[in-house]
């Protein structure tokens, strides 16, 4: 006996299911991101309550993310500009 053909699948239905799955994943990740952002805000508030300068902490976090050589180059240029303006 010959095998029966597979039922036809509507390509638009498959694409719609895939799109829905992608959207739901993005929404879930956005919710997680908002939760993490709230946690970070709480840590900064704790730091401020303990006497730390939050602006400086943010700058340190930013610097730690960057490559050492890139950071050194920017600092050298900044120093040059400050000297040119008589601020160093």
From Swiss-Prot:
Classification via Pfam families: GapR_DNA-bd
Record InterPro entries: GapR-like (IPR018753), GapR-like_DNA-bd (IPR046367)
Any one Gene Ontology molecular-function term assigned to this protein's record: DNA binding
Cross-referenced HAMAP family: UPF0335 (MF_00797)
NCBIfam families associated with the record: PRK13694.1 (NF010247)
Family: Belongs to the UPF0335 family.
Protein name per Swiss-Prot or TrEMBL: UPF0335 protein MexAM1_META1p2947
Native source species: Methylorubrum extorquens (strain ATCC 14718 / DSM 1338 / JCM 2805 / NCIMB 9133 / AM1) (Methylobacterium extorquens)
């Amino acid at each position: 006996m010959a095998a029966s053909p597979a039922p036809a699948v509507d390509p638009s239905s498959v694409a719609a299911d895939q799109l829905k799955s992608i959207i739901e994943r993005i929404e879930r990740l956005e919710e997680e991101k908002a939760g993490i952002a709230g946690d970070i805000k709480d840590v900064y508030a704790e730091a401020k309550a303990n006497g730390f300068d939050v602006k400086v902490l943010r700058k340190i976090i930013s610097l730690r993310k960057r490559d050492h050589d890139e950071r050194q180059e920017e600092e050298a240029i900044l120093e040059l500009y400050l000297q040119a303006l008589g601020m160093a």
